[in-house]
Every structure is written in structure tokens, then in C-alpha cells.
UniProtKB/Swiss-Prot annotation:
Source organism phylogeny: Bacteria, Pseudomonadati, Pseudomonadota, Alphaproteobacteria, Hyphomicrobiales
Family membership: Belongs to the bacterial ribosomal protein bS18 family.
Identification of the protein by name: Small ribosomal subunit protein bS18
Keywords, alphabetical: Ribonucleoprotein, Ribosomal protein, RNA-binding, rRNA-binding
Keyword field contains rRNA-binding: yes
């Protein structure tokens, strides 16, 4: 009585790549005066959320970071949220 070992081969799981929310026809423009938009990309502690979480492209992430920093400098956004 020989036992046949069958290994179960699983297909690899590929997570679908998210698209950049700032690319496309109806995409919002990144502006330092648009506080509601900028607050979506700031964590609860006031830090800028990385692009691997928000799926923002590298170019738009730099623009977003500069807009957040400019809004902080002008007093529109806080540096730290307590």
C-alpha cells in the first residue's frame, strides 16, 4: 500500500495595482489651498501618508508633499495633530 503524495499547487495571488487618483480626465488638481483634499493624505498624527498606501504616482506624491508643506507653512494645516 503505497501512498501517493500530491502537493497542492496554488496559483499565485496578484493584487491588482491601484490607479493614481490624480490621473485621468476628472482628476482633482493638487492645490495647497484645497485643505479637504490635502487632509485625506495626512495621517491621524499629521504625517504625510506614503504613496504605497494611497496609490499616488511618484510625480503626484512629490507635488502633494510640496502642497502639504506649503499649507503647513502658511498655517492652513497643522504640523502635528495631538
Amino acid at each position: 500500500m503505497s501512498e501517493i503524495n500530491q502537493t497542492v499547487t496554488r496559483r499565485p495571488f496578484h493584487r491588482r495595482r491601484k490607479t493614481c487618483p490624480f490621473s485621468g480626465a476628472n482628476a482633482p488638481k493638487i492645490d495647497y489651498k484645497d485643505i479637504k483634499l490635502l487632509q485625506r493624505y495626512i495621517s491621524e498624527r499629521g504625517k504625510i501618508v506614503p504613496s504605497r498606501i494611497t496609490a499616488v504616482s511618484q510625480k503626484r506624491q512629490r507635488e502633494l508633499a510640496n502642497a502639504i508643506k506649503r499649507a503647513r507653512f502658511l498655517g492652513l494645516l497643522p504640523y502635528v495633530i495631538k
